């Protein structure tokens, strides 16, 4: 059986050569761009408890978003309304923002967070949850104007993102 893993080793090689978190972020965004994704938010997933709002900034690993959207999201504590974060409370599988919006019990949260994100060109995205051996949960949420991802691409995206997380 002939396997051509050239692309896989190339992408993992970029990540291996990244010397810091900024380099990992750049590699991930370069990889994500081929699927229509241009933004990245990653961090340790909080429980949905507004009393921990002051602790949220310490959980952020990457926040490469349109600056105005990042400021609004953080100032308004949208993390506690975000359908993506709500879904992460129970789902450890890769999913799209559309999946999160469709499964959200609050249409108001979908309209508020999803609607406002779309004003900044963040219409759809892909979320890769990463469960640590210690029980902590991180998630990498990639967003953009469109999500063009087949089933095999999604599995490969998860491999790349998990490898990147291991580089942090």
Question: What residues fall within each predicted segment?
Answer:
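Juxtadomain coupling helices with adjacent low-complexity linkers
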Residues: 1-12, 143-168
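Short amphipathic alpha-helical segments
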Residues: 9, 13, 21-33, 110-114
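Helix-loop-beta substructure at the N-terminus of cytosolic sensory domains
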Residues: 21-54
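Positions that flank functional sites
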Residues: 47, 103, 132
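Regulatory sensory and allosteric helical modules in signal-transduction proteins
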Residues: 60-108, 114-118
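Alpha-helical bundle regulatory/interaction domains
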Residues: 121, 136-139, 164-165
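Short hydrophobic beta-strand micro-motif common in sensory/regulatory domains
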Residues: 124-130
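Sensory-domain boundary capping and coupling elements
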Residues: 130-144
């Amino acid at each position: 059986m002939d396997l051509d893993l050239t692309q896989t080793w190339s992408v993992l090689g970029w990540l291996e050569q990244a010397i810091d978190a900024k380099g990992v972020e750049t590699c991930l965004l370069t990889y994500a761009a081929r699927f229509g994704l241009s933004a990245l938010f990653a961090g340790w997933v909080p429980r949905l408890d507004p009393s921990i709002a002051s602790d949220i900034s310490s959980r952020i690993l990457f926040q490469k978003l349109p600056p105005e959207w990042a400021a609004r999201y953080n100032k308004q504590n949208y993390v506690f309304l975000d359908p993506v974060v709500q879904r992460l409370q129970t789902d450890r599988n890769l999913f799209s923002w559309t999946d999160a919006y469709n499964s959200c019990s609050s249409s108001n949260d979908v309209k508020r967070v999803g609607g406002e994100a779309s004003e900044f060109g963040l219409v759809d995205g892909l979320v890769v949850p990463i469960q640590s051996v210690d029980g902590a949960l991180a998630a990498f949420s990639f967003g953009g104007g469109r999500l063009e991802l087949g089933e095999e691409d999604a599995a490969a995206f998860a491999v790349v993102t998990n490898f990147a997380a291991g580089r942090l």
